[in-house]
């Protein structure tokens, strides 16, 4: 028989186990009350996973009586070992409140979910706070851990920098800098040499220093117990500030230079030219001079760096109160160390903490300079595109504003259209029919008007002189395609609404008209509805079914009057020739299923 629920006693470590498993999550996931796995929902009165839900359901439905536990019924039910002891697992299910009478149908209310998440976040925050405060109980141990982390992760401590700086001062060759111009007139890049090579080497050597700052922050007492989002926020905001505090000993106010890691000095003027940030470098030199005037040792610098990293006023912190408590404890440790080493200067800690706003200002300047540098790189990468667009717009204005203006041969070669394309007369260019003018609104958006090009006539063409040139505008290839291509259906596309408004006829297409001089006959248009070539004037609303006799596009429409399944435009039914006007009113219905420029004329549904 199934054992009754009263025979199971509630273990005392139930709530402790729940608190322990909650710590492993970020406070936004509901956990199983039995094994600590991710809960799938509210089952049998408690939040449980699918495994524990199915286990409890099978146990109560089949009335299974499990073998008693051989370990004094004290098995720890976790996700990794929940299947080892079924007796203790069922006991745990009943202990946390699972019952067949507590089955609820429907979804869990949002208000209840919010309460559960709030409770879990509260438990998580309290657990983290207890863990952090446990590491910060002993000030002596905290101070020793911070100093050890600083000495292990910093390659330019005071003990290491002092002999290097003394050696650099005694060798004047290190401080010699070749002459250079502040504003050179030659825009070509100057090759790196001397001081500029030192700056580049110093920049490359900063990568290990940045990794050292990150490692130093991870080894701070209480930092690993903070939420991961807060750790990332503190590192992003404090890496440059800690690096600047550490590099303060590398700035030499006596020689007005900065010591590189290879033992050489870089003058401030060389830094101005190399990094192109005069104000930022001057501010960094001034800050380093003020910090060096305090004569701090490595222990005091280590504690000051820890205070800078764990700043509670960083934007985006989730648990700012906990960071505030850690910050206050570190400030107390700094006060104890400063008072021990500088008893004659009681205001040293206040002067040291007053440098934090200066660090924030330098950090902001550095971020702005870095953003500007990235934008400059992006602009330099896209400079050819911008130049081409500007030259293209100039050619467009010249072609539209003055069609008769002349271009040189080099300018014509730079044009997007080669001079070997077909040439149309200046009269057609001025009228705007051969160019992609305002009438063809769809082409105007795709490509601007083509400029005029200078074409030279060879001696074989009968030119009077080899230097003689004839100015003629380049013919737009789209006009040739619209009149000569058999793929054109004459149907209005989505970009030709302006054509419809400006057209004098409902059935005529101005974008498919052919110049009379170019064709050698009367002007003809293609019907937009049935793709027929008209011989009547463009104002006629009824299509003409007579086959054209003289037309350059005769080969394109040679199958218009035939019933054949060719890749050319198939003819519509004959009744459509009398329904052109009615089709115009319903064209919007079937134009939605027709691409703007169909490769083959598609017959609409009757």
Curated annotation (Swiss-Prot):
State the disulfide connectivity: none
Q: What is its main location?
A: nucleus
Task: Give a GO biological-process term.
Answer: negative regulation of transcription by RNA polymerase II
The entry's cellular-component GO terms read: nucleus
| Compositional bias per record (Low complexity), positions renumbered to this chain | 390-406, 501-512
Record key words, sorted: DNA-binding, Metal-binding, Nucleus, Receptor, Transcription, Transcription regulation, Zinc, Zinc-finger
Q: Would I find Ligase among this entry's keywords?
A: no
Any one GO molecular-function label of the UniProt entry: zinc ion binding
For this entry, the protein name equals Nuclear hormone receptor E75
Q: Which Pfam families match?
A: Hormone_recep, zf-C4
Its family? Answer: Belongs to the nuclear hormone receptor family. NR1 subfamily.
Task: Name the DNA-binding stretches.
Answer: 29-105
Tissue specificity, per the record, is: Expressed in the epidermis, eyestalk and the nerve cord of the pre-molt shrimp.
What are the residue boundaries of the NR LBD domain, all occurrences included? 138-392
Spell out the Polar residues composition-biased ranges. Answer: 546-558
User: Where in the cell?
Assistant: Nucleus
């Amino acid at each position: 028989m199934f054992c009754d629920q009263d025979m199971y006693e509630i273990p005392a470590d139930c709530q402790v186990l729940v608190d322990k498993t909650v710590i492993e999550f970020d406070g936004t996931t509901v956990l199983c009350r039995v094994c600590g796995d991710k809960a799938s929902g509210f089952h049998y009165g408690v939040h449980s996973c699918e495994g524990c839900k199915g286990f409890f359901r099978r146990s109560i439905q089949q009335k299974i009586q499990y073998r008693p536990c051989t370990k004094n019924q004290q098995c720890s039910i976790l996700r990794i070992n929940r299947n080892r002891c079924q007796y203790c697992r069922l006991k745990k299910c009943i202990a946390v409140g699972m019952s067949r009478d507590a089955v609820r149908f429907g979804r869990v209310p949002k208000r209840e979910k919010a309460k559960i998440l709030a409770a879990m976040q509260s438990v998580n925050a309290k657990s983290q706070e207890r863990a952090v405060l446990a590491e910060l109980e002993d000030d002596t141990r905290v101070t020793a851990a911070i100093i050890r982390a600083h000495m292990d992760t910093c390659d330019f401590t005071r003990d290491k920098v002092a002999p290097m700086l003394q050696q650099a001062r005694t060798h004047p060759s290190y401080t010699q800098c070749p002459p250079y111009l502040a504003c050179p007139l030659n825009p070509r890049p100057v090759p790196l040499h001397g001081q500029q090579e030192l700056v580049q080497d110093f920049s490359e050597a900063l990568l290990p220093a940045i990794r050292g700052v990150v490692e130093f922050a991870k080894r701070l007492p209480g930092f690993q117990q903070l939420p991961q989002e807060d750790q990332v926020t503190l590192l992003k905001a404090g890496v440059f500030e800690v690096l600047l505090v550490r590099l303060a000993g590398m700035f030499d106010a006596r020689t007005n230079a900065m010591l590189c890691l290879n033992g050489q000095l870089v003058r401030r003027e060389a830094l101005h030219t190399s990094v192109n940030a005069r104000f930022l470098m001057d501010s960094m030199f001034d800050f380093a001079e003020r910090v060096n005037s305090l004569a701090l040792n490595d222990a005091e610098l280590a504690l000051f760096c820890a205070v800078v990293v764990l700043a509670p006023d960083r934007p985006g912190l989730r648990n700012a109160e906990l960071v505030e408590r850690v910050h206050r404890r570190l400030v107390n440790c700094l006060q104890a160390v400063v008072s021990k080493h500088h008893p004659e200067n009681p205001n040293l800690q206040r002067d040291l903490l007053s440098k934090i706003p200066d660090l924030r200002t330098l950090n902001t300047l550095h971020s702005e300079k870095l953003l500007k540098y990235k934008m400059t790189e992006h602009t330099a990468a896209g400079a050819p595109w911008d130049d081409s667009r500007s030259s293209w717009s100039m050619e467009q204005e010249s072609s539209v504003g003055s069609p008769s203006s002349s271009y040189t041969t080099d300018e014509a070669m730079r044009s997007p259209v080669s001079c070997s394309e077909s040439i149309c007369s200046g009269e057609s260019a001025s009228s705007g029919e051969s160019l992609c003018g305002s009438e063809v609104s769809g082409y105007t958006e795709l490509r601007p008007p083509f400029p005029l090009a200078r074409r030279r006539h060879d001696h074989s063409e009968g030119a009077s002189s080899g230097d003689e040139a004839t100015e003629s505008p380049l013919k737009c290839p789209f006009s040739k395609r619209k009149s000569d291509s058999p793929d054109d259906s004459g149907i209005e596309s989505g970009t030709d609404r302006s054509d419809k408004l400006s057209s004098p006829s409902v059935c005529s297409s101005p974008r498919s008209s052919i110049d009379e001089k170019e064709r050698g006959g009367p002007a003809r248009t293609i019907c937009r509805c049935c793709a027929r070539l008209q011989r009547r004037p463009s104002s006629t609303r009824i299509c003409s079914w007579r086959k054209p006799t003289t037309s350059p596009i005769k080969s394109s429409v040679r199958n218009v009057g035939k019933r054949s399944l060719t890749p050319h435009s198939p003819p519509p039914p004959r009744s459509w020739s009398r329904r052109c006007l009615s089709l115009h009113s319903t064209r919007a219905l079937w134009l939605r299923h027709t691409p703007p420029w169909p490769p083959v004329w598609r017959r609409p549904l009757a």
